[in-house]
């Protein structure tokens, strides 16, 4: 139990864990992979020592693993392709309480006293980015394995709670979705498509639950391929559709920075102007080196009740061939949890 479990291509990996929940439980260092096509288990390279209740994230064929017991200055890295482990000595010593992968980027949830914040880890440089915004809603605690949908990290405490916190890895903002129907502990979050599931748990005065709650995230992701020529400029058209006055959508644009360069935040306005907001467009995040731009598009004019809101982003091709552009639209709308029958 309490192993790290994740899916990679057609395999499910199980790393570490412990033999039971008792005080005499033995820590496990074993690693196994289950192939969903052959329905066979395969033994993989062991951890250096037994580990349980790990924080972990997957990025570019590698798994990054942190101990959640006390502070650490190390991360263990598993190479899926070569079936080997290595240890990286980190640039600082910190208390890691969770980790998540967002579009092949590694984020680590750290605590400092009662404060907690997400921080991006750059494996190629073995460096941490600047500290993210401190969570304004809750103090540091023990959290279950987070789930990710369209650049947002969803997390819930293992102790009694009905609250689910959300961290937007692109805009560096915290929020909360509507509360779950049941106040429970040890419930597990899982994600599939645009749906979040809260599975099982324990309810005070009732016992172990066999219920599943479901929450649907209002998000639309479009992935398209562009044929480009190295050195040529192009315009990425971002269309939020017809928005009524005051209605808003968050638009996240992702390109491969090795294949395409974002030249400016907009073809119409300067970066500073967009940060303040102009003609219904506000720049929330601009990271051209990572191929990321986040905009908030708000309906600001009336034209028969609604009008089409769009933005144009200038880019330059760094390759000749095909490259992929991902555009995600998230609507600022409150949804409710429901029970899965």
Annotate the PLM regions.
Residues 1-220:
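Kelch-like beta-propeller repeat domains
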Residues 219-341:
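Acidic, low-complexity intrinsically disordered segments
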């Amino acid at each position: 139990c309490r192993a790290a479990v994740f899916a990679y291509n057609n395999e499910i990996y199980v790393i570490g864990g412990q033999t039971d929940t008792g005080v005499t439980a033995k820590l496990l260092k074993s690693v196994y992979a289950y192939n969903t096509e052959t329905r066979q288990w395969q033994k993989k390279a062991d951890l250096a020592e037994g580990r349980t209740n790990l924080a972990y994230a997957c990025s570019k064929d590698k798994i990054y693993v942190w101990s959640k017991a006390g502070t650490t200055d190390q991360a263990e890295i598993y190479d899926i392709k070569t079936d080997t482990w290595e240890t990286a000595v980190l640039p600082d010593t910190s208390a890691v309480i969770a980790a998540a992968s967002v579009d092949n980027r590694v984020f680590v949830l750290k605590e400092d006293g009662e404060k907690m914040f997400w921080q991006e880890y750059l494996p190629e440089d073995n460096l941490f980015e600047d500290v993210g915004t401190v969570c304004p809603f809750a103090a540091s605690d023990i959290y279950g394995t987070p789930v990710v949908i369209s650049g947002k990290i969803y997390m819930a405490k293992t102790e009694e709670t009905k609250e689910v916190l959300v961290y937007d890895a692109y805009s560096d903002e915290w929020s909360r979705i509507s509360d779950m129907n049941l106040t429970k502990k040890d419930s597990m979050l899982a994600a599939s498509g645009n749906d979040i599931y809260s599975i099982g748990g324990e309810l005070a005065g009732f016992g172990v639950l066999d219920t599943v709650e479901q929450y649907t995230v209002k998000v639309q992701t479009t992935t398209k391929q562009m044929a480009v020529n190295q050195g040529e400029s192009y315009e990425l058209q971002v269309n939020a559709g017809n928005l009524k006055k005051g209605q808003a959508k968050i638009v996240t644009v992702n390109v491969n920075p090795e294949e395409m360069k974002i030249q400016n935040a907009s073809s119409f306005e300067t970066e500073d102007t967009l940060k303040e907001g102009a003609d219904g467009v506000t720049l929330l995040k601009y990271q051209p080196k990572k191929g990321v731009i986040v905009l908030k598009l708000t309906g600001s004019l009336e034209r028969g009740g609604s009008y089409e809101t769009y933005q144009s982003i200038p880019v330059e091709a760094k390759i000749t061939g095909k490259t992929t552009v991902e555009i995600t639209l998230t609507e600022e709308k409150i949804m409710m949890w429901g029970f899965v029958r």
